A protein has these predicted regions:
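Rhodanese-like catalytic fold shared by cysteine-dependent sulfurtransferases
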Residues: 2-8, 13-57, 64-96, 105-142
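Short, surface-exposed ligand- or partner-binding patches at beta-edge/loop junctions that are enriched
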Residues: 100
Length: 142
């Protein structure tokens, strides 16, 4: 019986260790994400709001289909058509580009693509427009 109890406790601890969840970033500092070919920077909706007050970057919505936009968006480039739309992005691969989508999934894919293409100053808004709206911030529609 003791052996069975020991195995049950061990199994429970193992499950608990493997079931960890990724908590949302709460740091006040953007976080670097390493990917093949370099890295990009994750930024929260709160951090992006402050960045937009002194905008010094190209702001790109990569979500498809169109579901709205954040004010001051410079371009719309579908996340899966980045390579075919480089003309909509800065020619300078060191220029700061901030990406967003609806939830963060598409923009993360786009960020990895830009890094693979040699862009060195790529930023991705975690949580996308959903995180933006959660803060009570508005979206625009065409």
């Amino acid at each position: 019986m003791t052996r069975l109890l020991f195995v049950a406790i061990l199994f429970t601890l193992l499950l608990a260790a493997c079931a960890g969840s990724r908590a949302p970033a709460t740091s006040s500092q953007p976080a670097k994400v390493s990917v093949p070919g370099g890295s990009y920077t994750n930024v929260s909706a709160t951090q992006l709001k402050a960045m937009l007050d002194k905008k010094d970057f190209t702001f790109v919505n990569v979500h498809i289909p169109y579901e709205g936009e954040i004010a001051k968006t410079d371009a719309f480039v579908p996340y899966n058509e980045i390579e075919n739309n480089l003309g909509k992005l800065p020619a300078d691969k060191n220029a700061k580009i901030v990406l967003y989508c609806r939830s963060g999934r598409m923009s993360a894919i786009a960020a990895k693509t830009l890094v693979r293409l040699g862009y060195t100053n790529v930023w991705d808004m975690e949580g996308g427009m959903i995180a933006w709206e959660t803060l009570g911030l508005p979206l625009k529609t065409k």
